[in-house]
Amino acid sequence: MALLELKNINKFFGKVQAVNGVNFEVKQSEVLALLGDNGAGKSTLAKIISGVYAPSSGEIYFDGELMTKWDVQSARSKGIETVYQDRALAEQQSIASNIFIGRELSGSMSMGFINLKKQYEEADNLMREIGLTSQAFNAKTPLLTLSGGELQGIAIARAFYFKARLVILDEPVTSLSLNESEKVYNFIDKVKREGLSCILICHNIYQAYDTADRFVVLDRGRNVLNVEKKDLSAQQLIDSMREIAHSAHT
């Protein structure tokens, strides 16, 4: 059974149709690469999946259940987290505030203190595992002191920290060095083996091919290709995307 399934998803902004009859599914422990030119509808579709936008029509299934209500709260309750290109961080706040944002500690004050200390330790370990911060983790460290790569690390850590079932990564390594990017993709491979699913939006087709198990290509809001990695080579994927881009301009 698919973890997430989209059936005939459409999204209009006024008279403009940004997503047109999209169908695909994401399986457990699968990385799906969502590819396409700028304006193809990738980010809009990601925001539909994460609950930021409601689809104009179509059906969303999670664990085989039809989601009759779909918003950010519904998506998060199902274990869907997102890392956007702009990171959506509160840069006036601390590292801890951003990683734990939107979550409440449970229990008494004494138990809360213990939980908070444990969360700091777990978040520290996660940041070190991803390898994106050069600073020792400190709950009070303000984001204003961090580099672009470190900020991206915080955004990624926040998504993975709460043991999400599906993480949407929208251009997750745009501001990172090659070394930092490699660490992120290695981490994605690790959590996939542990059962987590990912939707990866990126422009680097070779990196997408190395990381993903399945590829969905969008063109003007439509999914025009849906194929597993075992069924084509990286060069065949590139050639297919070139043909799609050429047909879009003829």
Tell me the role of every PLM-derived stretch.
Residues 2-250:
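Glycine-rich phosphate-binding loops of nucleotide-dependent enzymes
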